[in-house]
Amino acid sequence: MVSPLHLFLQLLFVIYSLPDIHAVMIQDKVRTSTYANFILTNPTLFRDAVVLDVGCGTGILSLFAAKAGAKRVFAVDASDIAEKAEKIVKANGLANIITVIHGKIEEISLPEGINQVDIIISEWMGYALLYESMLNSVLHARDRFLRPGGVMAPSQCRMMLGLCDGSEIHKDRIGFWEDVYGMQCDTFVISLQ
């Protein structure tokens, strides 16, 4: 039997092969400009560095790293978006610096006999730090590929929680099953709770 986690991850690979989700992430100006500012305003950190982009998506962080002076960038993604990332890299004239690798970070080897990288970059946190389920993959990449004293960006996060009243959401999402156009469908609610 296939585990629910395995099914969830397979679904994520399908979703992340589509351009829509990447458009949403890149159009998040705070998120993308924060990465761009960090990478592009730290040329001494990135100059001549070997960089690993875990879960590269469209390759936007890899492009920033190459523009900041990275010697080599390995952009890894398990979904089919890697094929589009490769086209984007070529369209920007950076194929001599950026190598796109289509595969799971846990299963790939870096080419050119490279075993360690100087910097790992990744947009692993998704929404609310947990959505993309990438943290374990990034930690695997860190333990396997990051040289001692290397940089992981981002390297820390903080999650803050606040209480709220969800009764309206419950009413909209769960309560409405009690009367669906005059029909009783509340047996469906049991599977949602």
PLM features: residue spans?
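Class I SAM-binding transferase module
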Residues: M1-V54, T58-Q193
